[in-house]
């Protein structure tokens, strides 16, 4: 059964401050944002369609929003990563809690690093770890 209250709470973790953290870090300009879109067989909470400032090359950034289950969020990010140039998990935890999770769970750390997943604390509105750029080709069929 769908917990609509939880979905509404998670959507509140995404705002202009979070968006600007991502855009400024990567030097992108926003073209559009999409909420709760299906890509492949999976739903993505937020998709940012951006372009580079110099050459205006389009890029796609996927974002998974979670209240506090970082393991589930990273697992979902991995399942969706192949469709996006960057992928972020935005989670409502303090930075210290996020860092503890990463250091206490070596598999979680390896997954985050291996897939280039970025982490943002919605609680503190700060980037913990930036997402790495990946060349992707599958997204074009869905977004561009």
Annotate each PLM feature.
Residues 1, 20, 52, 109-144:
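Non-catalytic C-terminal interaction segments of nucleic acid-processing enzymes
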Residues 46-50, 58-67:
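Conserved catalytic cores of phosphodiester-cleaving nucleases, focusing on short active-site segments
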Residues 41-43, 56-60, 82-84, 114:
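Short connector loops at helix/strand junctions that flank enzyme active sites
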Residues 66-120:
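Catalytic cores of nucleic-acid endonucleases
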Residues 1-43, 49-55:
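Acidic-basic catalytic patches of nuclease active cores, encompassing PD-(D/E)XK
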Residues 44-49, 84, 131-132:
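Residue-level detection of beta-strand scaffold positions
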Residues 34-39, 61-71:
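Phosphate-binding glycine-rich loops and adjacent basic patches that engage nucleotide phosphates
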């Amino acid at each position: 059964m769908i917990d609509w209250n939880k979905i509404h709470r998670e959507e509140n973790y995404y705002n202009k401050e979070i968006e600007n953290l991502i855009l400024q870090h990567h030097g992108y300009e926003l073209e559009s944002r999409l909420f709760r879109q299906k890509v492949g067989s999976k739903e993505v909470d937020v998709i940012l369609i951006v372009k580079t400032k110099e050459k205006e090359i389009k890029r796609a950034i996927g974002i998974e929003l979670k209240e506090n289950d970082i393991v589930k969020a990273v697992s979902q990010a991995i399942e969706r990563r192949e469709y996006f140039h960057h992928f972020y998990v935005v989670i409502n935890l303090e930075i210290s809690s996020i860092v503890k999770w990463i250091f206490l769970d070596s598999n979680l750390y390896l997954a985050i690093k291996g897939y280039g997943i970025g982490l943002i604390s919605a609680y503190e509105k700060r980037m913990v770890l930036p997402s790495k750029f990946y060349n992707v080709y599958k997204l074009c069929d869905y977004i561009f």
